[in-house]
Amino acid sequence: MTWIGCFIVGSSFSLVMPFLPLYIQSLGVTGANVELFSGLAFASTALVSGLVAPMWGKLADKYGRKPMMVRASFAMTFTMSAIAFSHQMGGYWWLLLMRSLMGFFSGFIPNSTAMIASQAPKERSGYALGILSTAMITGTLIGPSIGGLLAQWFGMANVFLIVGALLALATLLTVFFVHENFEPVAKSEMLSTKEIISRVGDKHILFGLLITSFIIQVTTQSIEPFVTLYIKTLTTNTNNLMFISGLIVSAVGLSAMMSSSTLGKLGDKYGAHRLILLGLVFSFAMYLPMAFVQTPLQLGLLRFMLGFGTGALMPSVNSLLAKITPKEGVSRIFAYNQMFSNFGVVVGPLLGSAIAGWVSYRMAFVVTSLFVVLNFFWSLINFRKYLRKRSIVE
């Protein structure tokens, strides 16, 4: 049921992505402000969520992850549904407020991840977390196509009500069917975040994993602001431009979904730290050629192959975090990981669009690949004394 809940939450966020700019336009926003205000609406959720994630993580360590999952999906039921009434309640600023509150009350997926990480046997944590990550990836992948159809059939405002109903379903499923083996920690025994970090054996690895989560999101999100324009330069046939762009953007999610559980199992067998290094090398080998492609097909194939690198990185990062973190602080560490990921979601599109606008589309891919190279060498330095070992946990 945790998988189903993560799937619903993941798809709920992506369902509204295809038509949100059009909905903002219907609220009276015109001209160049549509792109600006759409960017603010998207970024506000991720930014606020990242800022408050440590607070919710601390509460999860104190009261349990399941209550935080229920809290998140229950609150998002109302904030998402309320966007349907933006025309009556204050237009764009109401929408922006609800999107920000959605970010404030979010936390379903990181708490699900922390719960699985704390309960799964450590020798199988990569496999378990890999399976869980497919829920979010699958939901995010199919959400935009379903959202576009629902908007055509029922109208844009009603889609927010439908998504609210889905989130209510996720709340009920979590309340009645998700079980957590959580032992409350006495207030006197509650560790501070500083104490939790002090108990992590190698703090360089912890910080390196957080940076890796940040860079995964920066690199995967950086293409989205200009992918349609880049594809337009690669072909003279613009009849199906939006459809082709959607396929190319979603290709990385499809292959990541296909591979993450299998690669997570390989990480358990051969070492998640080794898999991270291989994933970064492979990702670099896919990113750099994207700067030199001549056709949309070439770009799409490279994006599809890139997903196998992403599928190796995400469960491996989560698995290592679970292994090096004391159980009293799992939720807080995963909350910080979510914070770094969300900041990557905000920075990625800004960085990609800035480089594409100031230099060129192709240079944006070169810079992205350099970020991956830097992350590889940093990780190599952090993991250097564990390369001959299957596990970094003594």
Pin down the residues of each PLM region.
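Short amphipathic helix-loop junctions that connect adjacent transmembrane helices
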Residues: 19-35, 226-243
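C-terminal ends and interior cores of transmembrane alpha-helices
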Residues: 74-89, 282-294
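Helix-to-loop junctions at the C-terminal end of transmembrane segments
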Residues: 51-64, 259-271
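Helix-loop junctions on the cytosolic side of multi-pass membrane transporters
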Residues: 171-187, 381-392
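Central cavity-lining transmembrane alpha-helices of secondary-active solute carriers
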Residues: 40-56, 250-259
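Hydrophobic core of transmembrane alpha-helices in multi-pass small-molecule transporters
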Residues: 7, 92-107, 298-312
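Cytoplasmic helix-loop-helix junction between adjacent transmembrane helices
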Residues: 98-136, 320
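Juxtamembrane intracellular "pre-TM" segments in multi-pass secondary transporters
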Residues: 179-209, 394
